[in-house]
């Protein structure tokens, strides 16, 4: 597993995303990654809606268990602070969540405030519920609400498939940044396009078939 996360020497900044349900195991994993110099940043993923994960109480289902959520985030933040101090560098921990289980069981407010209190450096909201999975429309107004609620940076996620979507999210929510998920699958150049659009530049033309094939082969 460690070989799967080993970065290219040229990569900076290196980020790794973890998920789990056991605070002690998660803290140990974070410590190992920092001590072996495999990451500069840990993101805790509480956004996965896949049944095989949520049925075990993980992913998007975990924030419903407030005490466990707090224990897990706190354990990883402490582990990264301690391991980072020994390594002589700062290792920020960020948290990704969803709106809640469904429209009747919202968890984002408590989870976001808890993560901030426990020392999370930033929070990402996938603006859908667990039950929505990836269907329907993302509720960007929830991103704006958390942005107003928190003092730490808030990143938006959901329904960003092209540069225009990213600019629209920034304008409508006031979020501090964009997290791209499915929009990058098969289209890694979306990041180039977003950067160009954000800085007022011209979005480069799409890649040729030969370039796409080259990326797939790599």
Report each predicted region and the residues it spans.
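Non-cysteine beta-strand/loop elements that form the S-adenosyl-L-methionine
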Residues: 41-50, 118-127, 180-184
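Active-site glycine- and acidic-residue-rich loops that bind
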Residues: 24-26, 67, 92-110
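Hydrophobic faces of well-ordered beta-strands that scaffold small-molecule active sites
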Residues: 14-18, 40-42, 93-97, 125, ...
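Glycine-rich, positively charged N-terminal anion/phosphate-binding segment
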Residues: 1-36, 40
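Short amphipathic alpha-helices and their capping/turn segments at secondary-structure boundaries
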Residues: 25-42, 108-117, 171
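Active-site beta-loop-alpha junctions enriched in small/polar residues
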Residues: 19-21, 47-49, 96-102, 128-130, ...
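Glycine-rich tight-turn/loop motif centered on a GG-T
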Residues: 12, 51-69, 128-140, 198-203
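Alpha/beta catalytic cores of nucleotide-metabolism and tRNA/nucleoside-modifying enzymes
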Residues: 78-79, 83, 88-89, 104-122, ...
């Amino acid at each position: 597993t460690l070989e799967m996360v080993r970065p290219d020497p040229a990569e900076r900044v290196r980020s790794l995303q973890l998920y789990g349900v056991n605070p002690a195991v998660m803290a140990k994993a974070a410590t190992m990654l920092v001590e072996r110099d495999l990451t500069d940043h840990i993101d805790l993923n509480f956004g996965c809606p896949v049944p095989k994960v949520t049925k075990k109480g993980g992913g998007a289902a975990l924030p419903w268990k407030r005490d466990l959520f707090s224990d897990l985030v706190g354990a990883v933040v402490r582990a990264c602070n301690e391991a980072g101090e020994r390594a002589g560098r700062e290792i920020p921990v960020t948290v990704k969540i969803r709106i809640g289980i469904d429209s009747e069981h919202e968890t984002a407010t408590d989870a976001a405030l808890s993560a901030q209190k426990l020392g999370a450096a930033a929070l990402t909201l996938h603006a859908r519920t667990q039950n929505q999975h990836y269907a329907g429309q993302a509720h960007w107004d929830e991103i704006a609400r958390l942005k107003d609620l928190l003092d730490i940076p808030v990143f938006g996620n959901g329904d960003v498939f092209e540069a225009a979507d990213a600019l629209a999210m920034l304008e409508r929510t006031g979020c501090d940044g964009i997290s791209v998920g499915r929009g990058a699958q098969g289209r890694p150049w979306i990041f180039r396009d977003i950067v160009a659009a954000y800085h007022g530049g011209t979005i480069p033309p799409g890649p040729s078939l030969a370039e796409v094939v080259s990326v797939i082969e790599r």
